[in-house]
Amino acid sequence: SGKTLSYLMPTLDAIYRASCGEPVSSTSAYSGAENLNNRANVLYISPAKALSADQLTALTSYNLPGLHAASYDGDTPTGERRWIREHANFILTTPDMLNYSILSNHRQWASFLRGLRYVVLDEAHSYRGVFGAHIANLLRRLRRVCALYRTVPVFYGASATSSNPVESFSKLIGVPQQAVTAITESTSARGETTVALWEPEFMPPKAHDQLAKGARSTQQQAVQSKAEQEAPRRVSPVEQGAQMLTDLVLSRTRSLVFAGSRRSVEILSQKTQRYLDEVEAGLSHRVAAYRAGYTPEERRELERKLRNGELLGLASTSALELGIDISGLDAVLVAGWPGTRASFMQRVGRAGRSGQDALAVLIADDNPLDTYLVHHPEAIFGQEVEATVFDPTNPYVLSPQLCAAAQEAPIRAEELSLFGPHTAALLDRLVQQGYLRRRPDGWYWTHAESAADLVDIRGTGGGPYQLIDAEDGTLVGTMDAAHAMSQGHPGAIYIHQNAQYVVESLSEGERVILLSRVYPDYYTRAVESTEVRILVERARVSYSAPAGAAIPGEPAPGESAPETDAQQLAPLTMHRGQVQVTDQVTGYRRFSVYGGEYLGEEEQPMPPEVLMTEAVWFTFEPSYLFGAGVTEEDGPGTLHAAEHAAIGLLPLIATSDRWDLGGLSTLLHVDTGRPTIFVYDAAPGGAGISERGFNAVAQWLSATLEAIESCGCENGCPSCVHSPKCGNRNEPLSKHGARALLQAMLQSMAEA
């Protein structure tokens, strides 16, 4: 799109002029202040280390006099860091290092900060949800620290997929919208990209899988639910992606495949290599996997091989989604909808960057949202990319950020507006909790520990776990804390560059997961249980039963209903508020790597994890369900199926994917006393997703109903009401009941 050139021209020009002794002026648009010396330093911030490394390669290739560019991230050797602080004038870093190293140790960076003229935020659209809220506060902290050194840098936000650049960027850096100028003309030289939407075929009958891998034991069959056994299943996007990538590599088409998880990436790469070995020996080594958790050396080597053409096919997570400049890619496969139109366009844009025509294929996963999208291409191409949703005032985000800001410099009363309207109340609470100390001139951090350690920017729940080979003690890789319980539990299969391991043990205290090398023919998926408790109700909307509904027990005309509900809730009520979610991994399932066949389930209880977050929930009078045609027997399955489908379709109207959400349904909830469906944000403090559903409920539920009605299955399948995350093995489920209930809910809302 030409966005890189738009910030490189002014920043490199300033660096060159400063190196020649010429006067440099970079007046800030939002304050009128300017730097007081003639240095020209640039701080480039990207959400991924791979993107920073790519930009550094491009910068050094310019051989510009006076340019001293360097990466400063977790992979930077300790011996090089002091030189970078004292001599580099174009530093490429990540939000993590800005928090843990630069701002918290800003006195060591005084020389660089005094000459800081430009801050570049690459891929600015990626700062959404809780991550975006952290980045917004991090940038406010950066502006505070810059003010200590009497510098007011110009901020550049670069994004090729932003629907509201002025609004989102002004909110991100904390300035008025009138201070932001949008440059929206694309100047890139691109060929034509053909985009195909591919819905895989249904798999052969279950007997085919059993013949292929041998019959399972009766006990194993019994563990899998009846619904899952009988439901038709499509070929998985991983299997379909491996088949397509094999064909592309055989035709020497340089290709990139995006998959949704680390395990999927490894399996896809493994399958492709096996298929290639069956057809043309010697090609399998030109296919690899790329994801977080590899060592820095492994990542850099893979990036090098992809650029120079040694690799013909690469399976990647979102780690390669961002604007890494890889010329010569001819095809991109997207194995499963990535969650947002912005993310999809980013992935499609990886191909054809050298001006040649390109191919992009979305391979639909077997779930309601993917099914909806392949049959409604206008939902992808007929509208702008999603708004970037984040809330800088989220108290779970802002509280640790305020502690870090107070350590960098005491927070003065006149600065409170910088962090939002709830800052004073949060500061008082932090004083009461002993984190801060209030003095006449402001709020102080008085502890010996670094306050920056309280800030969990990526919501990973603490530092990463080291994956250690139990046989020789070598470091295999790392795993973030957010995935440790579900992917690092004993018995889990872990794949690293086609080498397979089984987890022997997990130590929370030592942050170590011990692995043993194995050669299994299955992969694992965790089984989880969930409990939701209501803490605070922030809003509610009440609806009556649909006109003409047959409500058992409803009073006759002229009679009044007895007041039996303590809360006086309506027949249908939609709520929004704060909830506490307790998740626990209780075991895991095994699936065949060949056809995805279910092989059995093992118990493996892990410590529970507690999440305080935001949710939307629906409560029903029992008579409302009867009036909608839902029998008492179908009640649990109706609520369960409606919950699954609603979670699957909410990402259609909010910047998220279904893995950013969780849910629970019950015929009698302990806090509401009635049938209840919960949909909650799977992030501490919330991410604004459920609130978007609350505010656009008719659009949300209409899409959910359409997805169910348009699915050709009889009793429910992954394309409509099954969920890959379900801890109850997708049982009970009533597709017909969910359809009837959603029809009644939409009628109630239309009549309100």
Annotated model-derived regions:
Residues 1-25, 35-95, 99, 103-410, ...:
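Helicase motor core with emphasis on the C-terminal RecA-like subdomain
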Residues 33, 213-221, 227, 546-562, ...:
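Acidic, low-complexity intrinsically disordered tails
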Residues 358-360, 366-384, 391, 401-413, ...:
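Extended Lys/Arg-rich polyanion-binding regions
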Residues 12, 243-244, 705, 723-724, ...:
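ASCE P-loop NTPase motor cores of helicases and related translocases
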